[in-house]
């Protein structure tokens, strides 16, 4: 019983799988069966019986080096041809001819739990994929035959596998009535399962052509066309009729069906060549050197024992051969020249079908196949050969560093604490606790030295307040000690999964704003919700005519008032000189109803009135919402200087963690003297607990307050801003703005104030200066687009505006975009947008890893209380994700990208967008000075460049990292000097020894080791490795990744 046939790439051999035997035959002898000269030449070259069951599939590797076979003994065997002649004669007890070729079994691959049904090699022979009745798709390395990944995606038996000739996808067919497309990148010869963790991902699932397909077929062998455009999927149905579905690449839809077989089609096979309808000549070549009218040929067979040959230029089969065997045809294989087709059947029949020139067409040269695949960005890079021993040593160190890195991460995830392990806490090293315990955070230096005292003097550093006991940790301890009793009455302590209980922080080192998902969510919630009034518009609804003549509303329609008595009564009262009192409702105007007089104690209103807007807003192209005038405005900070919830008005201060509270009380609108301008002043008070530390008064209504341990500030309704020291001393005269303030934030000595016309002001209280002139938000809010119309239109809203510890303004918008202002370039920079969210493979890929990075260079400055710009980029990207999903924009962008991927010229779209996203992240981290994120993004970017083999970008990256590290110092002093608004080590090309806070040598060594395993890049990386001493110094520590 024959199940499988496979062809070798050199046309000289083909192989068959039978009951426990793999037989290799000579095609030359078969082609010349009628020639007397070949009568004595052997047809069977070898026979191997390494399987203990029926063999279902055999496949030659495209490079002709290996042969793979799979059987119902759950084993995949790998054979290779030995140049030495076979050492044995014919098998004892058999009548077979002695073997001519010596095929040795070099590997037995164990990974399936049931029969192996089909095998497939990638076109560059880099991977082997096996599928079976255990519903598994197992990916093996084509070089080392190590198991790279197991895909348990299908829900039933998998019975077919085919590879994309462009080496981008492979497709599997299953009895769950689906064909699934997997995207992959060819692994390097020394890749491991860890390297390929994010490789081999599901791209698409196709189910429509197979919804009612029968489950009785032995196989579902599909095939990919040689031009990469189509997949022929067996065992499809078109209504009640069996068919072969032709699936289009990119869109993955099947609108073409090959109908004619009376039973389910079990096997399809495209010819490996492209054909022309006329003999190939120079006249048949167009201006772009492409042969014209290329067609493909496909053979189909199955349970009806018939064979059909189809050609894409003909809607009907050109050949139909019936009753080819006594049982179902199980497999088909074309010769590499496309002139012969081999078939096997379940009754043991082996068929060879020869075609004369012109019957199918005229085969094109293989170069034409390559030309047709170039539009898909074919990835046929060879294994590569290490040219020097330095390259091999660099490759070995790269792999050793990756293994140690994996072990370190796994140990951290499992909560392994070591006495020698250290983590960074506020720039200082602290022992890393074990069992997931969280180290107590030391007090901030600012909290020790700048706490305000009643007499205005600085106090001595106080001991940090003890952390409150974690209730989850206490509950966890109780659960650990909970006893259980066995049937015989013995007491046992029940085991507990420690990592899944409680809410204690991880033992991994954390960066600010990236401690955990819960802390990130809490950090994004504003400390208080400000009741905002509607933005002021220069013209009322209805335009200029409404401004001049008014825009009168109609009275609401009342039940029982069809004759309009209410409207007539209002009109009559107006004629008599009276002013009717009407209530403005959504349905229209209604006569006002008398209200009973209020009795008892009245609650203090949350807001008193809307703020009076500045007349300049009438001509401004940008108008932001202005906060209403509230009766009480409170800002509270804890002992570490962080904003916190103020004490509640119910008199329960014990629930608040506030250390100092800054309060502004606006007076009631009532006048003291009868004149409207003679009102009570605003009272500002700083409290610690119940004790007031200092008090001040302002003659203007306060809209916003902010503050920290360095200063306190209040913004007033007339656009003036006041600043006090922690002791209550006014640091500057009132700062006057052009409009009302709408946002007031602070961070350390920096204050950010945004006015109602979109002007951003940044001040440094310590130096009484500003890093740049006032900047407008119009570029950020797309003012250039929204002001093109005749009337003002709605623009994206500001959902968050913050300032970092370097005075950099960061703005998040309601359309999902995030911006930061660059003081060195005097312009806004777009850090995050929805385009990356739907187009990049790296979206949402940094939140956990960033917290896992430890400092690899010199210790941070002891005065640094937190990492500069830490978490800003993930914060903006989270806002992009939330806003995009909230507004449904992601659905339309995904549809756009899906359409683009199916169009010609966009085959490398996803890869290009992913690399561009990493470059945008890297540039943003460097500009903001986000040290930890920069190192992580650099590592991810280098690994992607190595996987893609982009030599030019790799060489440019290495040159940028090395900078002026090994250049001689300029003794003449004519080197480039930094401008006043520039930061050191924020430029790739400058000659500083550090880059974004990291020593350039450390970053360069990490990138070199990440790229060292790619042999096709070793001509670029080995010289840098020698320069750094990575491969020359044999006595250095083998742990090259540890710095």
From Swiss-Prot:
PANTHER family: MEMBER OF THE HIR1 FAMILY OF WD-REPEAT PROTEINS, PROTEIN HIRA. The lineage of its organism: Eukaryota, Fungi, Dikarya, Ascomycota, Pezizomycotina. This is Protein hir1. It is found in: Nucleus. Belongs to the WD repeat HIR1 family. Keywords: Chromatin regulator, Nucleus, Repeat, Repressor, Transcription, Transcription regulation, WD repeat. The keyword Cell division does not apply. Gene3D superfamilies: YVTN repeat-like/Quinoprotein amine dehydrogenase. Residues 424-472 are annotated as: Disordered. It comes from Aspergillus fumigatus (strain ATCC MYA-4609 / CBS 101355 / FGSC A1100 / Af293). The keyword Repeat applies. SMART domains: WD40. InterPro entries: CAF1B_HIR1_beta-prop, HIR1-like, HIRA-like_C, HIRA_B_motif, WD40/YVTN_repeat-like_dom_sf, WD40_repeat_dom_sf, WD40_rpt. One of its GO terms (cellular component) is HIR complex. Required for replication-independent chromatin assembly and for the periodic repression of histone gene transcription during the cell cycle.
